Structure formats: structure tokens, C-alpha cells
């Protein structure tokens, strides 16, 4: 996989921060289903910084901007600068990749999709976007890159990162927008015993589960939340959040989802979709 980033660290634990689905707009006052996404994202970042936790790497797992605007991507970059840590990104279904390539190319942003993290771990960032539609699919090119990279680093524990979800949410309206070829992903991963976990966003809710023996993690959006186990489109009153991950030298993972505590953002519960 091209664009390899090497994070040299002799310490036994690598600490990651995942933020996902900010859905920023050109207009800072714009709302998504009743929530000002600029304000909610700013609040998430503020509370992360107040914790004073030292992260090694930040993962931004898609749907960074809702309306393909230059201003949205420029503002995202500016808002990430205070962390002074490399920020790696993947596209979500709402993102416009030409704009991502244009604006997410300056520090702290980094376009690498293969991260060598310390002596024991690697993270592989996959593009599951099918432009113009909500569901996801990994192209044959992405699957081939994944297989090639895993084959070159068989001794490293591996975290696979993408936008779209693998596990059903038990919400019919949302599960039609899943990763359509998860079976092909499973076939590629199967021979590589050091693959430990899969991380994604997209579903605007927390998941800590298992799929084919891999730990599976999904993370709340920094804006609106989708209510699980609902046949029809439903919003939740849970607050915006983020995920912190520790990758240990023995291959184990410790992780925690946190949500904002110092403010409240409530969507318009009467909305029937977006």
C-alpha cells in the first residue's frame, strides 16, 4: 500500500483518537436535523483537549463535510491544528474526494493509508465510498492493496479502518447503506491471523462487538445520533462523542467511547430522514 506513514515509538502502548461524521457545512450556522454541526464538533474537540490525554495519532473516519464545500474542509483542517498530531482521513459517503485531496494535504492532515505504529502494530485505512450513493463497497483495487499490505507485514497486529458498517444495526433503513461486499473483505482477511480489529463510523452510534473473530468498533458521530434497533429512520438523544483506543504490544486493545458532558445538542425528533 502506497503512502506509508511510520510512527516510531518504543513505548508499549500506541494511543489513537477516532473522530467521525462531523458533517460540516459551508455555513457555520447550518444545522443537520436541528443540530449545528459546527458547534457540536467544536464542543467535542474542546472536551477532548480539556482531558489532556496524549494521543499519538488521530483517525478521521469520514463524512467530514456534508455539502462538498471548500469552506467545510478548510475549517476542519483549522479545527484539528491545536492537537498538533497527525490526522489521517478516509472518505465517507457524503465526502467529495477531489476536495479532500485538495484541502486535506497540509499539516496536521496526512493522506497516508498505511500506518506503521510503533514496533508491533499497523493500521490500514480503506476507501469504501461509492460516490453518489449512501452504501459502501470495497473496490477490487482496495481489496488487492489490503491483501498485498497484509502479506508484506504478517508479523504486525493490524487494525482495519473504513467508513461503512459491517454488522447489522437492526435498523432496516440504515442497514441498506452498509458495506455491500463484507464477504469479500472477510475472504481477504481470513489468512492473516494478526488482524485484530475493524473500526468504522457511518452509523452514528456506538458498537463494541465481534465479526468473524475480529473485534468490531463503531463510534458516535460528533453531531446527530441514530437510534439503533429501529425499522424506520429514528434519531437518538444521546450526545455527540468520540473514541479513544489503546493498542498494546501483546496485540490486545483497550477502548472507550466518550460523550460530551458540558453542553447538550438535541436534534429535531420529528425529522423523517435527510
UniProtKB/Swiss-Prot annotation:
Observed effect of gene inactivation: Mutants show increased levels of cellular cAMP.
Catalytic activity: 3',5'-cyclic AMP + H2O = AMP + H(+)
Free-text function comment from the UniProt entry: Hydrolyzes cAMP to 5'-AMP. Plays an important regulatory role in modulating the intracellular concentration of cAMP, thereby influencing cAMP-dependent processes. May coordinate responses to nutritional stress, ensuring optimal competence development.
Binding, Fe cation 1: 21, 23, 63, 204
PANTHER family: CYCLIC NUCLEOTIDE PHOSPHODIESTERASE CBUA0032-RELATED (PTHR42988:SF2), PHOSPHOHYDROLASE (PTHR42988)
Cofactor: Fe(2+)
Name of protein: 3',5'-cyclic adenosine monophosphate phosphodiesterase CpdA
E.C. numbers: 3.1.4.53
CDD domains attached to this UniProt entry: MPP_GpdQ
UniProt key word Hydrolase: yes
Gene3D superfamilies: 3.60.21.10
Tagged with keyword Oxidoreductase: no
Amino-acid positions noted as binding AMP in the UniProt annotation, renumbered to this chain: 23, 63, 93-94, 204
GO molecular function: 3',5'-cyclic-AMP phosphodiesterase activity; metal ion binding; nucleotide binding
Source species of the chain: Haemophilus influenzae (strain ATCC 51907 / DSM 11121 / KW20 / Rd)
EC supergroup of this enzyme: hydrolase
This protein's UniProt keywords: cAMP, Hydrolase, Iron, Metal-binding, Nucleotide-binding
Family as reported in the entry's similarity comment: Belongs to the cyclic nucleotide phosphodiesterase class-III family.
Residues involved in Fe cation 2 binding: 63, 93, 163, 202
Cofactor comment: Binds 2 Fe(2+) ions per subunit.
Amino acid at each position: 500500500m502506497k503512502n506509508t506513514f511510520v510512527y516510531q515509538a518504543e513505548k508499549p502502548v500506541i494511543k489513537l483518537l477516532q473522530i467521525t461524521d462531523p458533517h460540516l457545512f459551508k455555513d457555520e450556522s447550518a444545522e443537520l436535523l436541528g443540530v449545528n454541526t459546527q458547534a457540536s464538533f467544536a464542543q467535542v474537540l474542546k472536551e477532548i483537549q480539556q482531558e489532556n490525554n496524549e494521543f499519538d495519532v488521530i483517525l478521521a473516519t469520514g463524512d467530514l463535510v456534508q455539502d462538498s464545500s471548500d469552506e467545510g474542509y478548510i475549517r476542519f483542517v483549522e479545527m484539528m491544528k491545536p492537537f498538533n498530531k497527525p490526522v489521517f482521513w478516509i472518505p465517507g459517503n457524503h465526502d467529495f474526494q477531489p476536495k479532500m485531496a485538495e484541502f486535506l494535504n497540509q499539516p496536521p492532515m496526512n493522506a497516508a493509508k498505511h500506518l506503521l505504529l510503533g514496533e508491533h502494530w499497523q493500521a490500514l485505512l480503506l476507501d469504501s465510498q461509492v460516490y453518489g450513493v449512501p452504501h459502501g463497497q470495497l473496490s477490487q483495487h482496495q481489496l488487492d492493496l489490503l491483501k498485498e499490505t497484509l502479506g508484506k507485514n504478517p508479523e504486525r497486529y493490524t487494525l482495519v479502518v473504513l467508513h461503512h458498517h459491517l454488522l447489522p444495526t437492526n435498523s432496516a433503513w440504515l442497514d441498506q447503506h452498509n458495506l455491500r461486499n463484507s464477504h469479500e473483505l472477510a475472504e481477504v482477511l481470513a489468512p492473516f491471523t494478526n488482524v485484530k480489529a475493524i473500526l468504522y463510523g457511518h452509523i452514528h452510534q456506538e458498537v463494541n462487538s465481534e465479526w468473524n473473530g475480529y473485534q468490531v468498533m463503531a463510534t458516535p458521530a460528533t453531531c446527530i445520533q441514530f437510534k439503533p434497533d429501529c425499522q424506520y429512520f429514528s434519531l437518538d438523544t444521546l450526545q455527540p462523542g468520540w473514541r479513544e483506543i489503546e493498542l498494546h504490544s501483546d496485540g490486545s486493545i483497550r477502548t472507550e467511547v466518550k460523550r460530551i458532558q458540558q453542553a447538550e445538542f438535541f436534534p429535531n425528533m420529528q425529522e423523517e430522514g435527510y
